[in-house]
Regions:
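Oxidoreductase cofactor-interface core, primarily capturing Rossmann-like NAD(P)-dependent enzymes
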Residues: 2-38, 42-57, 77, 115, ...
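Structural motif
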Residues: 11, 90-91, 119
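NAD(P)H-binding glycine-rich loop region in Rossmannoid oxidoreductase-like domains
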Residues: 50-115, 129-132
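Hydrophobic beta-strand scaffold residues
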Residues: 69, 119, 158-159
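Short, amphipathic alpha-helical "lid/cap" segments that border enzyme active or binding sites
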Residues: 83, 201-209, 298-306
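Conserved residues at the C-terminal ends of beta-strands
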Residues: 95, 123, 165
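Short beta-strand elements of ligand-binding domains
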Residues: 118-124
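A hydrophobic C-terminal alpha-helical subdomain
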Residues: 254-309
Length: 309
């Protein structure tokens, strides 16, 4: 791992200010500005209304804190156009997610490299794509693997991948099919012994800023963080203990999920369930996480649930 010192006065660009981007920016903007740096944020041109007012109060708060917004439609932009937008920034943190469509993450990464950006945090805030590899049943994950390969094949731009597991809230998304608080059901993906790592967006934002600032500087490394790593059996116990309710339990086995996927190959949530039922790459021990090793507290599932039930 190459090490170098953080410089004051850095120009940082964040791509996206949605759920994760806003969480990252809440910690990042004050940290960078205190060091005489600047933060710019690329968002869609649709982020303003017809009167040129910001549609999001969060965007307005970030602007008031000193961040500058740049309207760019990344999905419709070429690599060359993005290269021009990215040129001159010291660090780019990609919080765009998958909403911009297939191929976008590779396009962004190529533009970052062609622009000669010093340091890049790609959109890899998820599972361990190196372990998952290709053919997981989730096509966008194949692209994530390719992004990692592209970064490792070059030596101009430093990169940092922050692996977070699932957003904690996603476990409780009814469409995902794991915990449904309204219907009081819990399904294990693959089996009750299977494990999953989760982190809240607020913790991801705070930890990403800490990793960005850390000395010696972290470069060319996958950094694992987590709010909690749990088995589905322990998850069921946690949910019932916190809610003081009894939940109906079920298991979605890998063969059953594969058969459902054969019948409904374009169902995105079903593809997620198939991928997580594999187990490999979906979790890591808390003792291996950067936050645990640096004694930084994070929100576990019980704490998250107490504030969201």
């Amino acid at each position: 791992m190459k090490q170098s010192n953080n410089q004051v006065g850095e120009k940082v660009l964040v791509l996206g200010a949605g759920q994760l981007g806003a969480s990252v920016l809440a910690s990042l903007v004050p940290a960078v500005t205190q060091r005489n740096g600047s933060v710019c944020i690329i968002v869609s041109g649709r982020s303003r209304d017809k009167q040129s007012k910001r549609r999001s109060s969060i965007h307005q708060q970030l602007a008031d804190a000193g961040a500058r917004f740049i309207p760019v439609d990344i999905a419709d932009s070429s690599v060359a156009a993005l290269k021009d937008q990215f040129h001159g920034f010291d660090t780019i943190i990609n919080c765009m997610g998958f909403v911009a469509g297939a191929g976008t993450q590779i396009k962004i990464t190529r533009a970052v490299l062609e622009a000669g950006v010093k340091r890049y945090f790609p959109w890899q805030f998820g599972v361990n794509y190196d372990v998952v590899g290709k053919g997981s049943g989730q096509p966008v994950w194949d692209e994530q693997y390719d992004v990692g390969t592209l970064l490792r094949e070059q030596n101009v731009t430093e990169w940092v991948i922050v692996s977070t597991g699932l957003f904690t809230s996603f476990l409780f998304e009814p469409a995902f099919g794991v915990v449904n608080l309204a219907q009081k059901t819990i399904n294990a993906l693959g089996g009750w012994e299977m494990q999953v790592t989760v982190t809240s967006p607020a913790d991801i934002g705070r930890l990403t800023t800490e990793i960005y600032l850390h000395q010696p500087r972290i470069t060319n490394e996958v950094v694992f963080v987590a709010g909690e790593t749990t088995s589905y059996a322990k998850l069921a116990e946690t949910v019932e203990r916190v809610t003081q309710q009894t939940f109906t339990r079920g298991v979605l086995t890998q063969p059953d999920l594969q058969e459902q996927l054969r019948l409904h190959p374009h169902d995105p949530m079903l593809r997620y369930r198939v991928a997580f039922a594999r187990g490999d790459g979906m979790w890591w021990p808390m003792s291996d996480t950067w936050n645990a090793q640096h004694h930084l507290p994070t929100q576990d599932i019980a704490a998250w649930l107490k504030t969201h039930q």
